[in-house]
Amino acid sequence: MERVADGVWLLRGDLRKSMNVYFLEDGDGVVQFDAGSRAMVKSARAAAQELGGVKRVVLSHAHADHRGTAPSMGVPVFCHPDEVADAESDASIAPYMELSELPFAPVRWIYPFLLRRWDGGAVKIDGTVSEGEEIAGFQVLHFPGHAPGLIGLWRQSDRLAIVSDVVYLVDSTRLKPLPAGEASVPHPAWAWDHAKAKQSVHRLAALEPAVVCAGHERPLRGENLRETLERAADKF
């Protein structure tokens, strides 16, 4: 676990430590944002305990690699209203995903296995969060596209964006990280609405963040993040 900003800790785990779970300081405990993969349950529990205990889990969206620890944390779980049905489903592959669109056959074949491996199963959703609400000092922003109810968190004071899969810092078509300093819009194979996914990346770019914490790999930092994100929106 590493501290990535004031009151924000990142736990990386599973496949080449590319799955990210964030803990946000909230009074005498923490809020967990995103839930990584099922293999991270033990480390997520330990991290939460070290930080004073987790109060609730907030899912950025309901994909298998972002809900994995949620059923096992023993606290209320929240998500955007448009993600509730998928979060409470036992399906590891969202109904709108088109894995046949991935360009390389070996990757197309392995993803169904990986998604089942990462998934912690159906999640009981205890409440919802929407655009404009506040979580641990962050503003909730709705970034639809990759998933219908994908949300990110924005803190104006240090221009910190925690955005899960609004942008990818990995090449999901090859299962490897992108070169340092690069980002992309998620591949259309994963998207509920790819055009909206690109619009969401443009919206993120317009915020002019100083740091972007995504759902996979290390935070993206630099002086020209707006330009990086604008290029990312047109990657696919």
Where are these regions (language model features)?
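Conserved beta-strand hairpin/beta-sheet module of binuclear metal-dependent hydrolase folds
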Residues: 1-47, 153-169
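Soluble, non-transmembrane catalytic domains of enzymes that act on hydrophobic metabolites at membranes
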Residues: 52-56, 64-68, 72, 131, ...
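Active-site HxH/HxHxD metal-binding segment of metal-dependent hydrolases
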Residues: 39-127
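Glycine-rich phosphate-binding loop signature in dinucleotide/nucleotide-binding domains
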Residues: 49-53, 133-136, 156, 207
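Metallo-beta-lactamase
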Residues: 37-38, 139-142, 148-223
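Residue-level marker for buried hydrophobic side chains located in beta-strands
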Residues: 31-33, 58, 77, 160-162, ...
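Alpha-helix-centered segments that form part of catalytic cores
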Residues: 108-136, 191-203
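Binuclear metal-ion centers of metallo-dependent hydrolases, dominated by the metallo-beta-lactamase
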Residues: 217-236
